[in-house]
Design a protein with these regions (language model features):
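Single conserved hydrophobic/aromatic residue that forms the stacking wall/gate
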Residues: 1-12
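FIC/Doc superfamily catalytic core
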Residues: 11, 16-284
Length: 284
């Protein structure tokens, strides 16, 4: 039985075709036949009102940013995502690295992490925002994003592939599923259920929290989750969530751990929405 059993409604049924192709051990998913699903509520009433404020506000629109603002957004987003992982680069050092290719005398892995994040973020931004495209968030996109984020940081055999061994998450007693079949089954469920969330903010939170909790890869799971969250927002022409404040990094972690341990979205959803509202009000 999967460690995720408590998160799945009793009426959820997922049938898998075991004869489906499984090329490359774990990269191509078996076909899933979804019999019935019940949608979990992500936002409470107050959060729904905040979400509507964000969706209706012109300052939330990604397409209204100028090219220099786009670059600044990419830098601060990468700094934010890296800092959550314990990256030691300061904001100034991150900016020098990503804009001017000036490397600080710090760990190679820290610079590589930030460059991978930046290149992936910019690539998605250009495809969606500049190219006026929608990025389909499916397993192929997820594997591609993870591979781009983790290149040079994990082995080639584990970059862009589902993990085949157990992982632990610091700061929580929650243990992600260990069995490849359970990981694969839950991932198919997550990617299917996202379609039920027509509110792009809810969809972004749903994808972020559930992919992070599943930990489908050997490393880089939260980075991948934040990138997928951002892609879901970009698809809706919404500026992704970011912060450079230490207190926000702490609140992000608290919100995610609360979801790991209880399945309750409210703490992370509150953080996510409040960051969007604060950013809008700061520049109004």
């Amino acid at each position: 039985q999967s460690d995720w059993s408590s998160d799945v409604c009793s009426s959820d049924l997922l049938a898998f075709n075991n004869d489906s192709p499984n090329i490359g051990n774990n990269k191509i998913q078996p076909q899933a036949t979804i019999v019935f699903m019940i949608m979990e509520q992500i936002f409470n009433k107050e959060q729904q009102e905040k979400a509507q404020f964000i969706l209706n506000h012109p300052l939330a629109r990604l397409s209204d940013l100028h090219s220099n603002e786009i670059k600044d957004l990419a830098v601060v987003w990468c700094y934010y995502s890296g800092k959550i992982e314990g990256n030691t680069y300061t904001y100034v050092e991150t900016e020098a690295l990503l804009k001017d290719d000036i490397t600080s005398e710090k760990k190679y892995e820290d610079a590589k992490m930030l460059k991978n994040l930046y290149n992936t973020f910019i690539s998605e931004l250009e495809y969606i925002n500049k190219g006026k495209n929608q990025e389909v968030i499916d397993e192929r996109t997820l594997f591609r994003v993870h591979q781009a984020i983790s290149t040079g940081l994990v082995s080639d055999e584990e970059s862009g592939y589902l993990r085949t061994r157990g992982v632990r998450i610091s700061g929580t007693a929650y243990i992600p599923p260990k069995n490849l079949h359970d990981i694969r089954a839950k991932l198919n469920e997550i990617l299917y259920q996202q379609e039920q969330y027509t509110n792009p903010l809810e969809r972004a939170v749903y994808l972020h929290c559930n992919i992070a909790k599943l930990q489908p890869f050997i490393d880089g799971n939260k980075r991948t989750s934040r990138m997928v969250e951002s892609i879901a927002l970009m698809n809706a022409d919404i500026i992704p969530v970011y912060s450079s404040k230490d207190a926000d990094i702490l609140n992000y972690r608290k919100g995610l751990i609360a979801f790991y341990e209880t399945g309750d979205y409210s703490f992370y959803a509150g953080y996510f929405l409040d960051k969007q509202v604060e950013r809008i009000k700061e520049i109004e």
